[in-house]
């Protein structure tokens, strides 16, 4: 069964936006608050490119792009990239960094629901990384992503599982013990179980293709993609053909 979900009010948590606005100027500091994003980006990019059959020449939308770490890297692969975010400061940082780097990315400040209403079935690839756990209605985001992708196109989601281990690793460990991200970055109540995400996907034209975990080893201080979705995970889906 295919269903569409449309938000009446903007699907925005202003407190979440404020968190990222406050540290936006340090988005491209490789040793700053966003160091983990810089470190996992090659893994994310590699997974997206491989599962999409390459990004060169493809039209790509990065939902919740922030300061543009993933968006820029996909543009470097030869994609035509649009970055979407509701934070004015992160977008300003993203635009400036792209200009300094000589990389063309079109950054737009609007919700994914608003963008889907204007640009249905316009993208070969849609990415939504570490964003679902920061909005009031993540289901609405999933539905909007499904509307944005072309038939046969690829949609990627990444988020955090909701369980005791995820709370221990992503909140206690990352925020308080190892101080990898600022305190208060995550709210365990907003974490999303894979079954919940897959349930929302099943309500759309998207079909699950692959799911994989993103794992951090504190002993070696390294990240890797591997089976096991008990903390961070990525989901690859494709849009059904007409």
From Swiss-Prot:
<keyword id="KW-0808">Transferase</keyword>
<feature type="binding site">
    <location>
        <position position="85"/>
    </location>
    <ligand>
        <name>S-adenosyl-L-methionine</name>
    </ligand>
</feature>
<feature type="binding site">
    <location>
        <position position="129"/>
    </location>
    <ligand>
        <name>S-adenosyl-L-methionine</name>
    </ligand>
</feature>
<comment type="similarity">
    <text>Belongs to the methyltransferase superfamily. UbiG/COQ3 family.</text>
</comment>
<dbReference type="GO" id="GO:0102208">
    <property type="term" value="F:2-polyprenyl-6-hydroxyphenol methylase activity"/>
</dbReference>
<keyword id="KW-0949">S-adenosyl-L-methionine</keyword>
<dbReference type="Pfam" id="PF13489">
    <property type="entry name" value="Methyltransf_23"/>
</dbReference>
<comment type="pathway">
    <text>Cofactor biosynthesis; ubiquinone biosynthesis.</text>
</comment>
<keyword id="KW-0489">Methyltransferase</keyword>
<dbReference type="InterPro" id="IPR029063">
    <property type="entry name" value="SAM-dependent_MTases_sf"/>
</dbReference>
<protein>
    <recommendedName>
        <fullName>Ubiquinone biosynthesis O-methyltransferase</fullName>
        <ecNumber>2.1.1.222</ecNumber>
        <ecNumber>2.1.1.64</ecNumber>
    </recommendedName>
</protein>
<feature type="binding site">
    <location>
        <position position="44"/>
    </location>
    <ligand>
        <name>S-adenosyl-L-methionine</name>
    </ligand>
</feature>
<keyword id="KW-0831">Ubiquinone biosynthesis</keyword>
<comment type="function">
    <text>O-methyltransferase that catalyzes the 2 O-methylation steps in the ubiquinone biosynthetic pathway.</text>
</comment>
<dbReference type="InterPro" id="IPR010233">
    <property type="entry name" value="UbiG_MeTrfase"/>
</dbReference>
<dbReference type="GO" id="GO:0061542">
    <property type="term" value="F:3-demethylubiquinol 3-O-methyltransferase activity"/>
</dbReference>
<dbReference type="GO" id="GO:0010420">
    <property type="term" value="F:polyprenyldihydroxybenzoate methyltransferase activity"/>
</dbReference>
<feature type="binding site">
    <location>
        <position position="64"/>
    </location>
    <ligand>
        <name>S-adenosyl-L-methionine</name>
    </ligand>
</feature>
<dbReference type="GO" id="GO:0032259">
    <property type="term" value="P:methylation"/>
</dbReference>
């Amino acid at each position: 069964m295919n269903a569409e979900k449309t938000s009446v009010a903007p699907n925005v948590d202003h407190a979440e936006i404020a968190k990222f606005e406050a540290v936006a100027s340090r988005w491209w500091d490789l040793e700053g608050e966003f160091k983990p994003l810089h470190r996992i980006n090659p893994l994310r990019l590699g997974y997206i490119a491989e599962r999409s059959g390459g990004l060169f020449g493809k039209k790509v939308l990065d939902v919740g792009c922030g300061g543009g770490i993933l968006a820029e890297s996909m543009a470097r692969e030869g994609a035509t990239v649009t970055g979407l975010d509701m934070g004015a400061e992160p977008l300003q940082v993203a635009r400036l960094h792209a200009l300094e780097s000589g990389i063309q990315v079109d950054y737009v400040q609007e919700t994914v629901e608003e963008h889907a209403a204007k640009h249905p079935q316009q993208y070969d690839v849609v990415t939504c990384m570490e964003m679902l756990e920061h909005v009031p209605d993540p289901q609405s985001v999933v539905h909007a992503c499904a509307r944005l992708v072309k038939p046969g196109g690829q949609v990627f989601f990444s988020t955090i599982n909701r369980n005791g281990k995820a709370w221990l690793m992503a909140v206690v460990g990352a925020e308080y013990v190892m101080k990898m991200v600022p305190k208060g970055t995550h709210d365990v109540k907003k974490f999303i179980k894979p079954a919940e995400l897959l349930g929302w996907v099943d309500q759309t034209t998207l079909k699950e293709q692959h799911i994989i975990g993103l794992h951090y080893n504190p002993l070696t201080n390294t990240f890797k993609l591997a089976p096991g979705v008990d903390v961070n995970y990525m989901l690859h889906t494709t849009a059904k053909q007409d």
